[in-house]
């Protein structure tokens, strides 16, 4: 089985020689580097682990740093184990030329997240009457329980289709046809759509449902395709830069908020220390003044006693 990790660049449309228009998804699959081979004797299963998108070591967490230090290789943003793939040694590179025009592949990726959605959008339920006298919410999903009560209890069955989180799940699109390969730019053009947003991770692998071989696809205007690909690459690059800038701005804002919080705590501690110092500096009775006050009090009490005896 053939597999490769790539990055979704975007979608374009192209024309075949017979005039038909087809949708095309551009996937940039940089060389996948083989990191290690899992064996039955050592690991209990057979697999090939690859790395995709080389990054700086400072962007890794401690477990990732430890792993790449252990295998003595460069750091990669994504790592994945390929099952049923053999014939590669550690350090080998898997390129886009493992596929040819006309091959059938499966594309696996995480879909766009839609957040919390209603049952009509999530499960394609029927919309209620939209007239003014409908009498209940127009997009209400209806009853979620069953049972008549009494001896037959009413309850909500497991797996009931209801409102909830929609999207951001692993989806596989089967039987996509490879349109063309551009080895110099590490590009794979696939007929049809692929899940996920721009710059998302995509796994392409040989399809498991269809063994039918399709003739190589011939495009009518390769130059127009090249221009469209270049435009989509630029859009993907700008989107990636905007995402990085937003993340950097968010990190700077958090850093500034922490700094202001530390300054506020430091100022409060200084004010508290100053108040305690002022409290300690207040004048107190000396040792010489204390006996004098005691004598005055004793004289006053003696005079009061004498007045009472008279």
UniProtKB/Swiss-Prot annotation:
InterPro entries: Ribosomal_uL3 (IPR000597), Ribosomal_uL3_bac/org-type (IPR019927), Ribosomal_uL3_CS (IPR019926), Transl_B-barrel_sf (IPR009000). The keyword Ribosomal protein applies. GO terms for biological process: translation. Residues 240-310 are annotated as: Disordered. Keywords: Ribonucleoprotein, Ribosomal protein, RNA-binding, rRNA-binding. GO terms for cellular component: cytosolic large ribosomal subunit. PROSITE patterns: RIBOSOMAL_L3. The keyword Nuclease does not apply. It comes from the Bacteria. One of its GO terms (molecular function) is structural constituent of ribosome. Residues 240-281, 290-310 have a biased composition (Basic and acidic residues). NCBIfam families: L3_bact (TIGR03625). Belongs to the universal ribosomal protein uL3 family. One of the primary rRNA binding proteins, it binds directly near the 3'-end of the 23S rRNA, where it nucleates assembly of the 50S subunit. Part of the 50S ribosomal subunit. Forms a cluster with proteins L14 and L19. This is Large ribosomal subunit protein uL3. The gene is rplC.
């Amino acid at each position: 089985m053939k597999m490769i990790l790539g990055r979704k660049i975007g979608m374009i449309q192209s024309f075949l020689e017979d005039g038909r228009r087809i949708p095309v998804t551009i996937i940039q699959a940089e060389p996948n580097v083989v990191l290690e081979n899992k064996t039955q004797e050592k690991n209990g299963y057979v697999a090939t682990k690859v790395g995709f998108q080389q990054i700086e070591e400072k962007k890794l967490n401690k477990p990732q740093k430890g792993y790449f230090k252990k295998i003595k290789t460069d750091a990669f943003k994504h790592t994945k184990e390929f099952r049923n793939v053999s014939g590669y040694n550690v350090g080998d590179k898997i390129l886009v030329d493992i596929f040819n025009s006309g091959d059938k592949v499966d594309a696996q990726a995480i879909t766009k997240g839609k957040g919390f959605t209603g049952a009509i959008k999530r499960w394609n339920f029927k919309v209620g009457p939209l007239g003014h006298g409908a009498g209940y919410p127009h997009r209400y999903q209806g009853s979620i329980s069953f049972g008549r009560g009494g001896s037959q209890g009413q309850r909500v069955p497991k797996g009931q289709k209801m409102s909830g989180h929609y999207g951001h799940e692993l989806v596989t699109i089967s039987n996509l046809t490879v349109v063309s390969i551009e080895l110099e730019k590490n590009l794979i053009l696939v007929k049809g759509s692929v899940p996920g947003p721009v710059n998302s991770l995509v796994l392409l692998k040989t399809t498991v449902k269809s063994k039918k071989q399709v003739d190589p696809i011939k495009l009518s205007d390769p130059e127009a395709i090249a221009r469209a690909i270049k435009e989509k690459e630029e859009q993907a690059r700008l989107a990636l830069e905007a995402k990085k800038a937003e993340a950097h701005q968010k990190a700077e804002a958090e850093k500034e908020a922490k700094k202001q919080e530390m300054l506020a705590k430091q100022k409060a501690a200084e004010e508290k220390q100053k108040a305690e110092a002022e409290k300690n500096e207040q004048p107190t009775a000396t040792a010489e003044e204390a006996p004098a006050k005691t004598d005055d009090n004793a004289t006053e009490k003696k005079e009061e006693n004498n007045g009472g005896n008279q």
